[in-house]
């Protein structure tokens, strides 16, 4: 049993299982409840509602994006299951809130890491900007991010960077957690860009992502929530961090979106924008520390 927490992730697993093993997996979710296949992929919510029906059915349970295991929905599925093997998968085994300490309670102490040769080494391009990110401990973080996202000059900067790197042959991923900002930047970039946010249906998301994978679109604007986990678009080779990131596990996952090996792919690049202001400067130096720890080359533009 493979446990996933979104429909696109479930669909992605189903595609890969069919590609690798040559048979269609069973699906639990979206009105289906199929237990006959050797591999079954299920949605958390449906599995949670049917815990009694599934708990003695499987010998192995794989939990994708296992950093969600501390949520009651996931933990109940695992706690009640009679399976012999439990395997957790995640791009990052740390959580900012420290709850990663429960991982070993569920999955034991053995940790397998994929060999580094599955990944390419990115170069970091540090872009100095004159745009200011608001300081002030009393101003909520969300308000500060919104103010930055509504800054016309900042929107043009992001759109211009995306277009410039796309012109160099990159397939560019721009991530932010402000939907209106992403849509505005996508319009500025022009018809070679697509925008994937929470209000796009799962079917349409796949169509838009396919335009990046197989079509002539070369800039993908997407929300952090969608692209920090689960969606793999191996052709992406450039990441633009359009919202300040001060969370190492999140940064690890976002960078992971563009450094996967693929034949004919150009060397990946991460665009890190350094804004004015004390908060921005402190966060930027934390990110630079992270890049140094990974041993990645950095260039100031």
What are these regions (language model features)?
Residues 1-19, 95, 177-182:
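Conserved Walker A/P-loop ATP-binding site and its immediately adjacent core
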Residues 11, 22-36, 49, 173, ...:
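Conserved helicase ATPase core of P-loop NTP-dependent helicases/translocases
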Residues 29-60, 71-76, 226:
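Conserved helix/coil segment N-terminal to the catalytic DExD/H
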Residues 56-59, 221-222, 229-244, 252-253, ...:
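A short beta-strand element within the Helicase C-terminal
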Residues 59-60, 65-125, 291:
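Post-DEXD/H (motif II) to motif III coupling segment of the RecA-like Helicase ATP-binding lobe
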Residues 90-93, 238, 246-270, 288:
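Conserved SF2 helicase motif VI
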Residues 136-187:
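Conserved interdomain hinge at the start of the Helicase C-terminal
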Residues 136-143, 262-301:
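C-terminal helicase lobe
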């Amino acid at each position: 049993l493979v446990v996933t927490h979104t429909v696109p992730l479930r669909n992605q697993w189903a595609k890969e299982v069919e590609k690798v093993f040559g048979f269609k997996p069973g699906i639990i979710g979206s009105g289906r409840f199929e237990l006959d296949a050797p591999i079954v992929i299920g949605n958390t919510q449906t599995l949670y509602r049917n815990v009694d029906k599934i708990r003695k059915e499987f010998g192995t349970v794989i939990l994708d994006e296992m950093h969600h295991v501390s949520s009651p929905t996931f933990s109940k599925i695992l706690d009640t299951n009679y399976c012999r093997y439990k395997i957790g998968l995640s791009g990052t085994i740390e959580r900012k809130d420290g709850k990663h300490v429960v991982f070993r309670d569920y999955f034991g102490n053995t940790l397998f890491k994929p060999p580094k040769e599955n990944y390419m080494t990115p170069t970091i391009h540090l872009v100095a900007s004159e745009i200011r990110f608001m300081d002030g401990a009393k101003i909520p973080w969300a308000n500060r991010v919104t103010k930055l996202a509504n800054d016309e000059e900042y929107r043009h900067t992001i759109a211009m960077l995306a277009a410039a790197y796309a012109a160099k042959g990159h397939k560019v991923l721009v991530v932010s957690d402000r939907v209106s900002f992403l849509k505005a930047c996508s319009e500025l970039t022009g018809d070679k860009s697509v925008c994937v946010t929470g209000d796009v249906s799962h079917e349409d998301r796949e169509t838009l992502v396919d335009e990046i994978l197989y079509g002539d679109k070369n800039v993908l604007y997407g929300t952090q929530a969608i692209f920090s986990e689960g969606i793999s678009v191996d052709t992406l080779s450039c990441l633009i961090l359009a919202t300040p990131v001060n969370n190492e596990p999140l940064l690890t996952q976002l960078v992971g979106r563009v450094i996967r090996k693929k034949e004919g792919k150009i060397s990946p690049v991460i665009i890190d924008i350094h804004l004015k202001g004390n908060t921005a400067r402190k966060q930027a130096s934390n990110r630079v520390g992270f890049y140094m720890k990974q041993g990645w080359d950095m260039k100031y533009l």
